[in-house]
């Protein structure tokens, strides 16, 4: 059953109190060493986030390094031709991302924006990407909510509201903002995303050695593999058939 956020907060208040601290402790011991983690340069973080929108970390790693070697800052990307940008994007697919990067770089006039509203207004940047950039680069208290975050929150708090429904998006966005450690938003956002990617995975999560197992609702209720929930949509496919009707007046005897 869907829960209003007020009811959700009342129901899980104790769990909320230990959630972020436990994640940060886990992250200190298990964080992944990624090149975009070792910088607070908003431009470099922006490039990494756009690459990772449709590309797995392992695949995007080398492409990121190659791209920023040729385009190390806003000015160099803005000054390049679209053909050259496409050349360095080749292999990543979803080329609209590269076109949006190029257009956004030109709109910046040499300086990366410094407010959430300005970052969110960049072409190709949505709520998640804006929150990630602002928290990682500027340590602003915005919760970045991606697939990993939906999964971790849904399982830990035992929430069965469909994550792709309007109500689900509102519920999880509000919850993500509530459990965010506002004194360490960059570390917290990276922690919960890494936790979802490494520990609380879609298939075969490592519940046996999970630091949150003692207070995880999905684990205690035997619903780990059932969460998060998505809306059931029946996919319809139109199929067309051609028929040939042959009629013959002749009769064959023999």
What annotation goes with each model-predicted range?
Residues 233-236:
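Short Gly/Pro-enriched turn/cap motifs at secondary-structure boundaries
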Residues 15-206, 212-221, 225, 238:
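Catalytic cores of DNA base-excision repair glycosylases
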Residues 242-246:
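Short beta-strand scaffold segments in enzyme catalytic cores
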Residues 249-254:
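Conserved small/polar residues in nucleotide/adenosyl-binding loops
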Residues 4-7, 11-12:
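Short, positively charged and aromatic/hydrophobic N-terminal segments
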């Amino acid at each position: 059953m869907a829960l209003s956020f007020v009811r959700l907060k009342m129901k899980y208040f104790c769990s909320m109190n230990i959630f972020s601290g436990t994640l940060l402790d886990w992250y200190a011991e298990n964080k992944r060493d990624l090149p975009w983690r070792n910088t607070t340069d908003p431009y470099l973080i922006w490039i990494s986030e756009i690459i990772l929108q449709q590309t797995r970390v392992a695949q995007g790693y080398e492409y990121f390094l190659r791209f920023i070697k040729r385009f190390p800052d806003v000015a160099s990307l803005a000054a390049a031709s679209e053909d050259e940008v496409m050349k360095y994007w080749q292999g990543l697919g979803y080329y609209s991302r590269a076109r949006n990067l190029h257009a956004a770089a030109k709109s910046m006039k040499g300086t990366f924006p410094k407010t959430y509203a300005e970052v969110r207004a960049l072409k190709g940047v949505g709520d998640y990407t804006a929150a990630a950039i602002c928290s990682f680069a500027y340590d602003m208290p915005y919760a970045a909510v991606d697939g990993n975050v939906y999964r971790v929150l849904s399982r830990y708090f035992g929430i069965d509201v469909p994550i792709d429904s309007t109500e689900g998006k509102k519920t999880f966005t509000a919850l993500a903002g509530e459990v965010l450690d506002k004194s360490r938003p960059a570390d917290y956002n990276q922690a919960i995303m890494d936790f979802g990617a490494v520990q609380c995975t879609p298939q075969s999560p490592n519940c046996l050695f999970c630091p949150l197992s003692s207070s995880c609702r999905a684990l205690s209720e035997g619903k780990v593999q059932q969460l998060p929930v998505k809306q059931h949509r029946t996919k319809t496919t139109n199929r067309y058939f051609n028929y040939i009707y042959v009629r013959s007046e002749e009769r064959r005897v023999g």
